[in-house]
Amino acid sequence: MILSDADIRRRLDEGDLAIEPLDDPELQVQPASVDLRLGREFLEFQRANISCIHPTSEREVDEYVDETYVEEGEEFVLHPGDFVLGTTKERVEIPPDLIAHVEGRSSLGRLAIVVHATAGLCDPGYQGQITLELSNLGTAPVALSPGMRISQLTFTELKSPAERPYGAERGSKYQGQTGPQASRIQGDREFGGDQ
């Protein structure tokens, strides 16, 4: 069952679902979602002469990105074809009986801005800010401002709570993240890690 605005407000009031800071619930809580705002931090991928990035090499992944901070009131311009990692301003805590889905806002989609490439899911038990995989699929640059509503978070109630929620065991490499996080795929078991 997808949670309605009344369900979302009730879960927030009960404290088992947390979204902080939720500065303007009247504006941010929508009929079946919560609007999340854009944070100030971005990871920009360098336009370098790199023949190939090996996702399993933490050094190569780290060398490929630059951190950028944008103050509220200023703009981050996302150019056509660009891909950057951003973050939500809000930190979320998802209880074991809910799963959350990150979606773009239709108003930004109509400007050709997408907020996730593949990672649109927040597992039960996840805690932290949400990394956004921002792309401009259009033909004109688009200015994004920290604090603007950038995405929607919807919640689906599970038939039963997760037995092993995110953060309880291995495989929780993004638990508690602050700011955008580059890939940590090198920590996956199939690549020699313990995740």
From Swiss-Prot:
Protein name, entry field: dCTP deaminase
Q: What UniProt keywords are attached to this protein's entry? A: Hydrolase, Nucleotide metabolism, Nucleotide-binding
| Annotated pathway | Pyrimidine metabolism; dUMP biosynthesis; dUMP from dCTP (dUTP route): step 1/2
Q: Which Pfam families match?
A: DCD
Instruction: Keyword check for Nucleotide-binding, yes or no.
Output: yes
Q: What does this protein do?
A: Catalyzes the deamination of dCTP to dUTP.
Q: Which reaction does it catalyse?
A: dCTP + H2O + H(+) = dUTP + NH4(+)
One GO MF annotation is: nucleotide binding
Domain of life, per lineage: Archaea
Q: Which gene encodes it?
A: dcd
Instruction: Give the lineage.
Output: Archaea, Methanobacteriati, Methanobacteriota, Stenosarchaea group, Halobacteria
